[in-house]
Amino acid sequence: MTDTTYDNSTELDPRIAARLKRDVKGLVAAVIQQYDTHEVLMVGYMNDEALRRTLTTGRVTFWSRSRQEYWRKGDTSGHVQYVKGVSLDCDGDALLVEVDQVGAACHTGKRSCFLEGGPLPVVEGHRPAEQQNGLS
């Protein structure tokens, strides 16, 4: 059960803030994923205020590293991200933000930012036979 007793709309819940491991600029990576298909759409960055806004408004807010300002996805493009859930990874240095994406997530107009860059060459790994079917 989630404790929702903290209700201060001007700062991030200190219990959440204490769990974050920010980079030297005070940012945490946020992986944005379509909530129903699990498609990875993009990666953005959040500071405490961007995370607070994301958790309390139902819309995703990022901190723009290039423009040094907050931006809410979809305000200019109409390609809104409606928050469905937010999880913190085990190390506290990354967020998974599940969204209902309207239109393209990428500034290039593609649904996912990972379509434009494309796959990189890789040596594909294969699971040993003894690890097949969930063994080991």
From Swiss-Prot:
Subcellular location: Cytoplasm
GO biological process: L-histidine biosynthetic process
Gene Ontology molecular function, alphabetical: magnesium ion binding; phosphoribosyl-AMP cyclohydrolase activity; zinc ion binding
EC number: 3.5.4.19
Catalytic reaction list: 1-(5-phospho-beta-D-ribosyl)-5'-AMP + H2O = 1-(5-phospho-beta-D-ribosyl)-5-[(5-phospho-beta-D-ribosylamino)methylideneamino]imidazole-4-carboxamide
A GO CC term assigned to this protein in UniProt: cytoplasm
Cofactor detail note: Binds 1 Mg(2+) ion per subunit.
Organism annotation: Bifidobacterium longum subsp. infantis (strain ATCC 15697 / DSM 20088 / JCM 1222 / NCTC 11817 / S12)
Class of the enzyme per the UniProt entry, highest EC level: hydrolase
Positions of Mg(2+) binding: 89, 91, 93
Binding annotation for Zn(2+): 90, 106, 113
Name of one Pfam family that matches: PRA-CH
The keyword Chaperone belongs to this UniProt entry's keyword annotation: no
Organism classification: Bacteria, Bacillati, Actinomycetota, Actinomycetes, Bifidobacteriales
HAMAP family: HisI
Keyword list, A-Z: Amino-acid biosynthesis, Cytoplasm, Histidine biosynthesis, Hydrolase, Magnesium, Metal-binding, Zinc
Highest taxon above the source species: Bacteria
Keyword Hydrolase among UniProt keywords: yes
Homology family: Belongs to the PRA-CH family.
Subunit structure, interactors included: Homodimer.
Swiss-Prot/TrEMBL cofactor(s): Mg(2+); Zn(2+)
Name of the protein described by the UniProt record: Phosphoribosyl-AMP cyclohydrolase
Function of the molecule: Catalyzes the hydrolysis of the adenine ring of phosphoribosyl-AMP.
Pathway in which this enzyme or protein is active: Amino-acid biosynthesis; L-histidine biosynthesis; L-histidine from 5-phospho-alpha-D-ribose 1-diphosphate: step 3/9
InterPro entries listed in its UniProt record: PRA-CH, PRib_AMP_CycHydrolase_dom, PRib_AMP_CycHydrolase_sf
